[in-house]
Curated annotation (Swiss-Prot):
This is Cytochrome c oxidase subunit 6A1, mitochondrial. Keywords: Membrane, Mitochondrion, Mitochondrion inner membrane, Oxidoreductase, Transmembrane, Transmembrane helix. It comes from Ovis aries. Its main location: mitochondrion. It is found in: Mitochondrion inner membrane. Belongs to the cytochrome c oxidase subunit 6A family. It comes from the Eukaryota. GO terms for cellular component: mitochondrial inner membrane. GO terms for molecular function: oxidoreductase activity.
């Protein structure tokens, strides 16, 4: 994911990565 809030699966695991 590159900051997209559509991949809840990937974003949930690397939420911190997407946040920063």
């Amino acid at each position: 994911s590159g900051g997209a809030h559509g991949e809840e699966g990937s974003a949930r695991m690397x939420k911190a990565l997407t946040y920063f």
